[in-house]
Amino acid sequence: MSKPTVALLYICTGKYTVFWPDFYKTFRQNYLPECDKTFFVFTDAPSIEFDTEPDVRRIYQKALDWPYSTLKRFEMFLTQEDALKAFDFLFFANANLLCEQVVTAEEFLPRTEQGEVLLMVQQPGFWDKTPPFYSYDRNPKCRAYIPYNCGRDYVSGGLNGGTAPAFLALCHTLARRTDDDLADGVIALWHDESQLNRYVAELDPAEYRLLTPAYWYPEDWHIPFEPKITVRDKSKWIDMTAVKGKKPELGFVARKWDAFCQNYLPFVLAVRDTLLLKHLPRYKAGHNP
């Protein structure tokens, strides 16, 4: 019986190339050892370590300004659609991940025999919260919008995938929605992650496998999961203010208002949206317009 084929999609433009060597070494050794893996590396670097290895494909990708470097990732992947169609599974992984524990196919791949075609991972900041308190995009003008009374899971934008047909369909839908938003002068709150969460909220939960934050465990955090895949702190490696810009400091009143908006206001807004009968459409994976 042949091994399942897996394409790992990896973006490291600009300073993010610093993460590539350790990512490659740990994922090559520990991630899905039962599968035949190929690394698709989107980078503006003229060369990267290991790019002569037979399982590495270096693809030129111009470094985009923030936030387009993350907004446009679905579009980037689709430049390789013809090659990616040949694989059984496709997964995107953030540049700063380490796979220091063995992650098996049995525990990670979508269980297609049960109807699962996508793989998502809980975002660790929200694993113990309820949907009104998730950091969904709440702007009705945005195509990533989710009302306060809707949604089910909050998933990470930095590790996800699925069967090749299902994931490529997802990329087409989210690339189109992102471009339509940009044409309207709108950018989703958390960019690709907000778009992804709207897509997931439209699905039957039986269509995606949801893993715990053990597979997206931030460095130096303390949450009740045994780390399998670690998220390295980017600020220890690169100047994030140079990439994203410096966030303005909030004054006392602004901090109090922000705390109220995070801890109490969602209750009220969830009741409002329920009374207004707000809801999301339901689509079968791959058929989201």
What are these regions (language model features)?
Residues 202-289:
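C-terminal catalytic/acceptor-binding lobe
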Residues 51-64, 74-76, 115-118, 226-230:
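Active-site regions of enzymes building and remodeling cell-envelope glycoconjugates
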Residues 1-69, 80-86, 256-261, 265-281:
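N-terminal anchoring/stem segment of glycosyltransferases
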Residues 61-93, 101, 191-200:
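A conserved donor-nucleotide-binding helix/loop in the catalytic core
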Residues 13-15, 46-47, 63-64, 97-99, ...:
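Short, solvent-exposed loop/turn segments at secondary-structure junctions
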Residues 46-55, 106-111, 222:
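Short loop/helix-cap segments at secondary-structure boundaries that form the rim of catalytic
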Residues 99-140:
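Conserved donor-nucleotide/metal-binding helix-loop-beta segment in metal-dependent transferases, i.e.
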Residues 146-236:
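Catalytic core and acceptor-binding pocket of nucleotide-sugar-dependent glycosyltransferases
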